Structure formats: C-alpha cells, structure tokens
C-alpha cells in the first residue's frame, strides 16, 4: 500500500495516546499502514508499539533534531519545555517509500472516520491542513496530508540553520508553516517559501476553546466533527474518565470521557488502567545490542485508581495534578481579573491645606476700595417698605403704562 497514517512519539509519556490512535484507526481502516516515528523510548514500549503499528521507525541519535540551538526564545514564549524535541516531526517528510501520508498527533479523540482525506490529489510541495485556532492564517500541524519528498525534508532542515527564528513558535508548526503558506497569502518575492497550504474544514482537527462563540459553533457542527485535538500540556490520559472540562454549561458530554470510553474498549480493556507503572529500562540507541534481544516482559500495568481517592497521575518521569474545572466568566466583562496597580499621591492622603486666595486684578482692587470709602461718606438711607404681595400671579408681570388717556366724563 502506498498510503499510510503516520505519527510521532518522543519519550514514553505519550504511550497511551499512541495506543489509542492505532486501535481507533484500525476500527475504520484496516487497509493502510500505521507508521510511528519514535525516539527516546524504552525497549518495552518499543515492543508494545510493534503489536499495533505496521512500522516502528527509530530515529537514530545522529539524525535527531534539537530545538534549543535554533528557536529557544520562540519556544520559551509557549512555556512548553516538553516540546523541545518536536522539530523531529519534519522526519515524516523523509518517508519517501510512501506516495501519500496522513500525519495525526497522538493527543486526539476520533469521533468519525476521516480516511476519505486520502481521496485528495496531493502533489510535492503541497499540504492540506486545518487553520490554527490561535492565528487562522497559520495551520495546525496536528493533522497534515502531504506527499513525502526528500527535497522538502532537506529544505526544512536547511532553513533551521539559514534563517534565525524561522519557526514562530520554536517548534515544528512554525517551521512547516514558513514553507507551506496559504495560497491566498503567498507573495512572489520570497524564495524561501516553496510550498502551498490548502485549508481543510475545521471538523478534521477541532481544537477546544473557551471563546464565547465556540460552544454554539460546536453544537451546530457536532455531527460533522471528525477529530478533537487536545492541545496544551494536559492530555485526556492524565485525567479521570469522569472529568468534565469542555464546556461549563454541560451542553456536551465530556470529550475526555468519550476518549476513555473508546480507550477502555481496546483489547478487551487491556489499556483501561489509569496509571501505568514507570518503565525504566534503557533507551534504544544506534549501537545498542539490546534491541535485538528477546524481551518477554510486557509493559506492566497497575490496577485502576479508586475515583474516590485523591487523584494524581504519574507516567514516565512526569507528575500531573488534576486541574481545576474551567468556570464560566463570560458575563464578567473583559479584563475583570486585571490586577492594575493603584498609585496614590502623598498629597491625596494628607489633611487638606487652606485654600489659596483667589487672585484679584489691580483694577478690581481699586474699585472695591472706592466703594468702601463712598459707603463711609454717605448717610444712612432709609429703605422703603417692600411692596405688598401680589394677589394674582399675573400682577407680577404688569408693565408700567407709558401712555395715559384722560377720562373726560
């Protein structure tokens, strides 16, 4: 078969996602190969992957790409040190023994069959993907349909050393976006960008968001969603099956619960336990002879935790606490939690001082002095009696007559 699904596993921590992806795809597609590129995994995990993947391709030490020398500042902005080795994803473009590959990240929930993407005609230097929720002019590299090419691979590799900060996020997504730009945004004066990106429906790679517009959009298109992508550091296998954290109003069943429901059905529940014991065997290296030895032991799996106990997930070398549920603050307005520093001037807290005298012009001073002297010289004037109050309101508006007609009677 010249078409295949492909993914990437760096370290043992994403093993649950790798097991989920292989078993879930096999439920709707038994014809195409399942390929996974691996690095820094234990021998036991390697043997387990061989049970479910058509090919397990080990990235040799001298071919691995480290992010740090290239895009450390950009990666630091994401605050995701766990993505330090994600640039190794570009090795998927070097699997030229396939005519067409569909890359899928391991942190996904598959709701519907999406093998129809293989019907798309794709050429070298073309890529089909879904817009990224963070900046839709870029695509999300969690799902990509493309034609493998040694030319594309070498071009991506060269850009890492030739163009400082070529990846806007320090990882594979920024680098691949630099080459495969949206056809509507392409400019003819940039020779560094050789590929073209064609946008797929958001239903093929839906990333969750707490944006107030997200829930109505998801509800309207729920039956069309093919794949849910759990972006961020917390993955579904790190949470309880009963964890609800997708939409605060409970309009949807938890996607995390759906992931666990599917996961528990694989291999008669063999992978159901929530906590996997640490696998501390030696890593697979280029000159390791242990990779050829027979390993009879399978990955040991502990009993599921009681959901009534305090929850803590441990796998590999990482430990995660269950995050607090997402609360709905959409009615609070923008920046309602902004802790803005309040500055208080010293004169605002002291007792108020005496008001300053109002400045008076020189002419006004002379006029006031003359009036005072005149009042001393004038005799006291007897004020007349005030007029009697009016009986009717209109009497106050009577005008003094200016003409008088004599009465000759």
From Swiss-Prot:
Positions that bind UDP-alpha-D-glucose: 8, 14, 80, 89, 105, 107, 140-141, 169, 172-173, 232, 235
Positions bound to UDP: 8, 14, 80, 105, 107, 229, 232, 235
GO CC, any one term: cytoplasm
Location of this chain's protein in the cell: Cytoplasm; Vacuole
Cofactors demanded by this protein: Mn(2+)
Outcome of mutating residue 212 to F: Disrupts glycogen biosynthesis
Keyword annotations from UniProtKB, A to Z: Cytoplasm, Glycogen biosynthesis, Glycoprotein, Manganese, Metal-binding, Transferase, Vacuole
One Gene Ontology molecular-function label: glycosyltransferase activity
Site (Important for catalytic activity): 89
GO BP term, example: glycogen biosynthetic process
Family: Belongs to the glycosyltransferase 8 family. Glycogenin subfamily.
Function: Glycogenin participates in the glycogen biosynthetic process along with glycogen synthase and glycogen branching enzyme. It catalyzes the formation of a short alpha (1,4)-glucosyl chain covalently attached via a glucose 1-O-tyrosyl linkage to internal tyrosine residues and these chains act as primers for the elongation reaction catalyzed by glycogen synthase.
Protein name in the entry: Glycogenin
Annotated organism of origin: Komagataella phaffii (strain GS115 / ATCC 20864) (Yeast)
Taxonomy of the source species: Eukaryota, Fungi, Dikarya, Ascomycota, Saccharomycotina
Gene from which the chain derives: GLG1
